[in-house]
Amino acid sequence: MHTLYIYATRRLWAAALLLLCLPTLTAQEPVPALSLDSCHAWAQSRHPTAKRYALTDQSEADAASNAAKGALPQLMMAGQATLQSASTHIPFTLPGIDLPEIAKDQYRLYAEAVQPLTDLLTVRDNVRLAHADAAAERSRVDVEMHSLKARVNSLFFGILAVDEQARLAASLCDDLRAGIGRADTAAAHGVALRSAGDALRAELLGAEQRIAELQATRRTYVATLALLIGRKLTDDVRLDRPAEPSAMHAEEIRRPELRLFESQKAVLGVRRRLLTDANLPHVSLFVQGGYGRPALNMLDNDFKPYALGGIRLSWNIAGLYTYRKQRHLLDVNARTLDVQRDAFLLETRMTLTRQETEMEKLRRLVTSDAEIIRLRERVKESARNQLQFGTATANDYIQYVNAEHRARLSMALHELQLLWEAYNHRTTLGE
């Protein structure tokens, strides 16, 4: 019995120690905060548009493989049966020689293998065109994926702004509760009316309603961000406020749109070479074997097999009629891309200039906000003390508390706007 008692006691102590350690173990593994960089990475890897990269790779491989097969010998089978108005004959007779009469119905079934020579240039450029088209398509996807960064920035910093407003609204509630305590004390000593406390309580209810609205707004933003990045997020997910990025200059523009313009010009360059290839003479080797009547001996009226081979030259000069205009059209398209690129760079630099001006303005506002908060806080503390002794009204205190709250909210929003603008600036540059 004594042994059982000791054993049970030890089990109880072990269970108690385990329960005491559980909170500690939990506290040692906090849920990591969500970072802006991870949101960018998830949005770009999990968005449906990202699947187009793999599809482009597949189409590129198929197109290049099909184009490369143009270098293989071209096999052809054909047959014909003809009824002619005349046939080969010798218009004189030879003594002692009986020449056969060639039938006017003739038949031929043959197979031919052709190995192109000059067309190998066209094959090479068709392979290059497949790769160039795929590179241009990847650049288009890059442009669409890059636009996701601005959307992620908007939601991420929107949530941070809501959090700051909720934090400051909670601080406002604390100030109002402190004011209610001072007002109730003053009313208890007969130096203030009880309506002063009621006015503060009404203001407190309004602040709490504002917090409830902000919480609903946050849930909406978090749900939208979760859809965009393809992750399950809880309503109370924490966001890691990023540090202000290092300054970059407008000369460092690395937008994917610029790569798209270059890849499109590369496609035009390949098409220009293909246009030249199409108007060259075509030289090929060929071998043909068949069975027919007559075969190669036109004076033999029997069905026989035959074979022949050689080199073939053909040149379709009809393409030269439109060659110059087609070449000019490609040149116009290339110049159009240059104009579009210049216009894009101009618009981008204008956006960068506006963003840099906005960031400088926000830095000045944040500096002045700090001084405004210091003065508003001093006035509020003085009004709180006066409220307790009945020398200030509840409305006065509410006015000063709200003024300080607006100043703190203004500074918090200006800081977030500065951070948001800095990351938008990097996104505009192509980071």
Where are these regions (language model features)?
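Outer-membrane beta-barrel architecture
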Residues: 65, 112, 274, 312-314
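Amphipathic alpha-helical coiled-coil segments
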Residues: 52-67, 144, 148-167, 221, ...
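Bacterial Sec-pathway N-terminal export signals of envelope proteins
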Residues: 16-17, 27-76, 191-193, 229-271, ...
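Periplasmic alpha-helical coiled-coil/stalk elements that build and connect Gram-negative outer-membrane
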Residues: 2, 6, 34-38, 62, ...
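N-terminal signal peptide c-region/cleavage motif recognized by signal peptidases
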Residues: 21-23
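Small/polar (Gly/Ser/Thr/Ala-rich) solvent-exposed segments
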Residues: 51, 74-93, 100-103, 114-143, ...
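Acidic, low-complexity, intrinsically disordered peripheral segments
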Residues: 6, 14, 28-29, 40, ...
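Membrane-embedded beta-strand positions in outer-membrane beta-barrel channels/transporters
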Residues: 76, 110-112, 156, 308-312, ...
